[in-house]
């Protein structure tokens, strides 16, 4: 018997964190990341990425933990659907890209502060600190 293994290499990864699958920036498809993953979970997409999340939100007034936040204000920038939702995690949120082919990549991370409303903003709550690792190297 002959066993054949096919290895599929991907050369791009675009995720709409906390949102539905959308096409933006002309022709780039951002994959859906809309599952209500809980406080301690690993979720794998149907393609080449997954995420792990840990932690409960203990210091807020919400009775159940919500792990996806939706912006309700009007956004005026192009491709605003990419900035409408966000995945939340109280301790750690990690995305993994699987089967990415060897090569040089350009990494673009897009962030939008959509959680605070009224007179509160990100600067009133302190810094946002995160680490980005590529091939086990902190960049």
Regions found by a protein language model. Name each.
Residues 1-139:
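Compositionally biased, intrinsically disordered or flexible polar/acidic segments
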């Amino acid at each position: 018997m002959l066993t054949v293994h096919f290895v599929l290499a991907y050369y791009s990864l675009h995720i709409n964190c906390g949102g539905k699958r959308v096409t933006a920036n002309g022709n780039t498809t951002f994959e859906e990341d809309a599952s209500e993953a809980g406080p301690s979970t690993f979720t794998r997409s149907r393609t080449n990425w997954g995420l792990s999340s840990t932690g409960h939100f203990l210091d807020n007034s919400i009775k159940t933990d919500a792990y996806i936040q939706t912006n309700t204000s009007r956004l005026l920038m192009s491709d605003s659907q990419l900035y409408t939702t966000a995945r939340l995690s109280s301790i750690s949120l990690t995305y993994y890209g699987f089967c990415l082919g060897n090569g040089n990549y350009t990494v673009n991370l897009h962030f939008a502060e959509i959680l605070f409303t009224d007179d509160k903003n990100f600067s009133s709550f302190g810094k946002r600190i995160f680490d980005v690792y590529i091939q086990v190297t902190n960049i």
